[in-house]
């Protein structure tokens, strides 16, 4: 046993399997854990350990997801696999499983199928940055030309959705044979792991990104000024730095003159910490929950965007009836609700509970946002949907 296993200082990367039902996503997940456990240490998972995915609730939405982990020589991976198509849709939209990259599983015996396309589209919409293809069940196809054809089809499909279809890695393997321990197919799993290590760049850590903190509360402290509190989402704010207050009202600039945590004064607040930030020359009524504090120039307020939305089913506590164009719910971003109107795609008249749908949203007040921001759709405080900003429009 190499000492590799005990090092916990390896970069951590989040990945997952996507693709059509029965193309072998779960078998591949099991094969990866088994082959890598042999070579790099770690725990091997059996197919049925992964297949019995526990139910999770993310923003009131029921999602079945399996989480496994594995190591390569240079990295530690957390990997998600979902049993059902609906679980993928929910997972990707809510960001319950944020992926730094995805492994698209396509059976060589079938080629791309409807859910293959849908998962690629979802990946594009929700901002999965990298896709690696694993062509599965290649042991069942004798004809080299057929394999070429399937690979070409998959590459074209990925290009259609703006992934670099011509350049991304495609591995031809057999998850089942690898799981059964056949050396030539185990080799293919190692090849896949090599691509995970080299093709998916190391994710930027939250602390290295520009400072942003959603404002949860505003207090005025006699003789000191106005304090805003919240959990720092990313980056670092240092005492004496300029910050912007963005969203809802016109953007204003101020200076952070103090940072405190648990009543202790600090010289900076970092990603993940709950802090109070003292703002120079800001009146209590100038700031409100729902705005964000950010490094100047790094985020802008917007009112109109294209989104991908999952509408909760009745069983999940969602609506019992469909909604139509002209629907005006609240959109909950970070810490606050903003009313908005929706435009449905051409030819879509109504949206049923349990559907996922692309929609354009126009808010009545601007919110600090970038592509990839998650939100909830609410009616009178009850969550009826979850969404992600696919593309800011205005």
Curated annotation (Swiss-Prot):
Report whether Nucleotide-binding shows up as a keyword of the record. Answer: yes
A GO CC term assigned to this protein in UniProt: cytosol
**Could you name the domain of life of the organism this protein comes from?**
Bacteria
Q: Which Gene3D superfamilies match?
A: P-loop containing nucleotide triphosphate hydrolases (3.40.50.300), Translation factors (2.40.30.10)
| Residues that coordinate or bind Mg(2+) | 26
Q: Where is it located? A: Cytoplasm
Residue ranges, annotated region (G1): 19-26
Give the span(s) annotated as G2: 60-64
Recorded catalytic reaction(s): these are:
GTP + H2O = GDP + phosphate + H(+)
Query: Where are the annotated segments for G4?
Result: 136-139
Write out the ranges of the annotated region (G3).
Answer: 81-84
Where does the tr-type G domain start and stop, copy by copy? 10-204
Enzyme Commission numbers on file: 3.6.5.3
Q: Report the Pfam families cross-referenced here.
A: GTP_EFTU (PF00009), GTP_EFTU_D2 (PF03144), GTP_EFTU_D3 (PF03143)
A GO molecular function assigned to this protein is: guanosine tetraphosphate binding
CDD domains attached here?
EF_Tu, EFTU_II, EFTU_III
Q: Which residues bind GTP?
A: 19-26, 81-85, 136-139
Its keywords, alphabetically, are: Cytoplasm, Elongation factor, GTP-binding, Hydrolase, Magnesium, Metal-binding, Nucleotide-binding, Protein biosynthesis
Enzyme class comes to hydrolase
Its biological function? GTP hydrolase that promotes the GTP-dependent binding of aminoacyl-tRNA to the A-site of ribosomes during protein biosynthesis.
Identify its protein family.
Belongs to the TRAFAC class translation factor GTPase superfamily. Classic translation factor GTPase family. EF-Tu/EF-1A subfamily.
This protein's assembly is summarised as:
Monomer.
Recorded hits in HAMAP family, A to Z, give: EF_Tu_B
Q: What is this protein called?
A: Elongation factor Tu
Annotated source species = Aeromonas hydrophila subsp. hydrophila (strain ATCC 7966 / DSM 30187 / BCRC 13018 / CCUG 14551 / JCM 1027 / KCTC 2358 / NCIMB 9240 / NCTC 8049)
The gene name reads tuf1
